Structure formats: structure tokens, C-alpha cells
From Swiss-Prot:
CDD domains attached to this UniProt entry: TenA_PqqC
Organism: Pseudomonas putida (strain ATCC 47054 / DSM 6125 / CFBP 8728 / NCIMB 11950 / KT2440)
Keywords: Oxidoreductase, PQQ biosynthesis
EC number(s) stated in the UniProt entry for this protein: 1.3.3.11
A Pfam match: TENA_THI-4
Molecular-function annotations in GO: pyrroloquinoline-quinone synthase activity
Enzyme class: oxidoreductase
A single BP term in Gene Ontology: sulfur compound metabolic process
Protein name: Pyrroloquinoline-quinone synthase
Record InterPro entries: Haem_Oase-like_multi-hlx, PqqC, PqqC-like, Thiaminase-2/PQQC
Family indicated by similarity: Belongs to the PqqC family.
Catalytic reactions on record: 6-(2-amino-2-carboxyethyl)-7,8-dioxo-1,2,3,4,7,8-hexahydroquinoline-2,4-dicarboxylate + 3 O2 = pyrroloquinoline quinone + 2 H2O2 + 2 H2O + H(+)
Chain's role: Ring cyclization and eight-electron oxidation of 3a-(2-amino-2-carboxyethyl)-4,5-dioxo-4,5,6,7,8,9-hexahydroquinoline-7,9-dicarboxylic-acid to PQQ.
The protein's annotated pathway: Cofactor biosynthesis; pyrroloquinoline quinone biosynthesis
Length: 251
């Protein structure tokens, strides 16, 4: 494969976009949510577990910044940190997600405690952050290109959730509305880095594997939630109904 001619930028972008067939919008858990078939517990479980992803995204982006010697890239990439953590004196995406939690009936302190985060979700998110720390900054930046498909998933929630789940406070949808514009902006930057960096066929094939790795992470998170909230088989379900799994080990 490494001896093959490289794809043109247009062909490479098309190959990247084709990976959208495996985006987690197609996972049965997501399909149930936007078709109105999810229970209150399933939506709350998704919000609680996804919060762990939200609070780790700034750490992923900080790792990219730490590994990146390109000042101009850093100047633009740092906006992602501000989007989630918030600028001084301002709320960011993390606070918006906490408000989403309140909107679906979760206590913010319980969300912050991460006591509801399933081990499978924690392992998947931790793998993503660890990849960003160890990979080259270009590879870590390119792994964010699941954002190519993100506007569609945010819009699907805005279109369907108010109709199917009137018990959710509409104020909680702020995060999805905000991310619509942010994700489109981030895609432009991430795609430009990717198309510029991967100019050999071997490099392009590696990038497609990296994007698949990120897709695997998102899909695996939902697999863990399906086990817990759809099949009623959370960790250790055969021996206890208690949430005995670890709540995060600080090193």
C-alpha cells in the first residue's frame, strides 16, 4: 500500500468523509434517542457518561498544544480550550453541559463526581487523551476530524428532542446550539492541517486508521451505555446492583 500513489487532496477528503458511515449517530443508542424511544434513565445515563468526555476534551487539546511548535496553529487551536473551559469570567461548554444535566434531571454535583461514569466509557475516553499526549501533534489534531460529522448529530438532537421529550427543560439545549457553529469552524482548521500534512499514500492510510480509532472510541462509549441502560447489564450486574466500579484513579 505504501508504494501506491497518494490520493489527491479532493480524493483524500472524500475518503475521510466516507468514514461518516461509522459515526456514532448510527449507533442504535443514538437512533433510539432521536427517534423518541429512549427512556428518561437512558438519556440521563448518556448525559452523565458523556460529561466525562466533555471534561477531558480540553486536556486532549492541551496535549496537542503542548506538542505543537507551530505558533500560528497554537493561536487558533487554543480557541478549543476556551470553548470548553470558558474564557476568564465566562462560562464554557462544560458549564453548558452541566445545565443540560440539570435539564434532564441530574444533580450537577453528581455529574461532577463522575460516580455514574461507566468503566467502558472511562477507558475509551482515557485512551483518546493518552493518544493525544503520545502522538505527533498533527496526528492528534487530525483525530478530531470526527467533527466533520458533528453538526448533523447536534442538529438531530435539536430537531427531535423537544418533540419527543417535553420533560427536558429547553434551556438545556444551549450546548448543542453553540456547538453547531463551533464544530463547523473547527472542521475547517482540522481539515486544513490534515490535508497539508498527509501527502503520501502511507500517511493518508495511517490517518484513515487514526480517524477509525476515534470512531471506535465514540462507538465503544455507546456500547457500554447500551449494556448498562438498554440491556440492564451494567458492570457486575450478575453479582450486585451497587455501582462498585472504580470512580477514577488519580496518578
Amino acid at each position: 500500500m505504501s508504494d501506491a500513489l497518494p490520493m489527491s487532496p479532493a480524493e483524500f477528503e472524500q475518503a475521510l468523509r466516507a468514514k461518516g458511515a461509522y459515526y456514532h449517530i448510527h449507533h442504535p443508542y443514538h437512533v433510539a434517542m432521536y427517534q423518541g424511544r429512549a427512556t428518561r434513565e437512558q438519556i440521563q445515563g448518556w448525559v452523565a457518561n458523556r460529561f466525562y468526555y466533555q471534561v477531558n476534551i480540553p486536556m486532549k487539546d492541551a496535549a496537542i498544544l503542548a506538542n505543537c511548535p507551530d505558533r500560528e496553529v497554537r493561536r487558533e487551536w487554543i480557541q478549543r480550550l476556551l470553548d470548553h473551559d470558558g474564557a476568564p469570567g465566562e462560562d464554557g461548554g462544560i458549564e453548558a453541559w452541566l445545565r443540560l444535566g440539570q435539564a434532564v434531571g441530574l444533580d450537577p454535583d453528581q455529574l461532577r463526581s463522575q460516580e455514574l461514569v461507566l468503566p467502558g466509557v472511562r477507558f475509551a475516553v482515557d485512551a483518546y487523551v493518552n493518544f493525544a499526549r503520545r502522538a505527533s501533534w498533527q496526528e492528534a489534531a487530525s483525530s478530531s476530524l470526527t467533527e466533520l460529522f458533528a453538526p448533523q448529530i447536534h442538529q438531530s438532537r435539536l430537531d427531535s428532542w423537544p418533540q419527543h421529550y417535553p420533560w427536558i427543560d429547553p434551556a438545556g439545549y444551549e450546548y448543542f446550539r453553540t456547538r453547531l457553529g463551533q464544530a463547523r469552524r473547527d472542521v475547517e482548521h482540522g481539515l486544513a492541517i490534515t490535508l497539508q500534512h498527509y501527502t503520501t499514500r502511507a500517511g493518508q492510510e495511517r490517518m484513515l486508521e487514526i480517524l477509525q480509532f476515534k470512531l471506535d472510541i465514540l462507538w465503544s462509549m455507546l456500547d457500554a451505555m447500551s449494556m448498562a441502560y438498554e440491556l440492564n447489564r451494567p458492570p457486575y450486574h450478575s453479582v450486585t446492583q451497587e455501582r462498585v466500579w472504580h470512580k477514577g484513579i488519580t496518578l
